[in-house]
């Protein structure tokens, strides 16, 4: 799945204009289903992307 930070979720689906998912924590979105990820893991993932 892809790491999407600040994803919007509505009833477990990723939608624009929906409720902000996970209180600003990173989300993993797969098949329009959002999963919340711990902040630490999200930061590590982001660091790996920018390296």
UniProtKB/Swiss-Prot annotation:
Which UniProt keywords are listed? Answer: Disulfide bond, Knottin, Secreted, Toxin
**Which ranges of the sequence are coiled-coil?**
none
UniProt-listed Pfam families: Toxin_9 (PF02819)
Instruction: Reply yes or no: does the keyword Ribonucleoprotein apply.
Output: no
Where are the disulfide bridges?
9-22, 14-27, 21-36, 29-34
Q: Where is the signal peptide?
A: none
How is the protein altered post-translationally, as described in the entry? Contains 4 disulfide bonds.
Tissue-wise expression: Expressed by the venom gland.
| Gene Ontology molecular function | ion channel inhibitor activity; toxin activity
Q: Where in the cell is it found?
A: Secreted
Keyword check for Disulfide bond, yes or no. Answer: yes
What GO terms fall under cellular component here? extracellular region
InterPro entries found in the cross-reference section? Spidertoxin
Per the record, the domain of life is Eukaryota
Task: State the similarity comment.
Answer: Belongs to the neurotoxin 02 (plectoxin) family. 07 subfamily.
Domain note: The presence of a 'disulfide through disulfide knot' structurally defines this protein as a knottin.
Protein name, entry field: Toxin CSTX-18
Q: What does the record give as the organism's lineage?
A: Eukaryota, Metazoa, Ecdysozoa, Arthropoda, Chelicerata
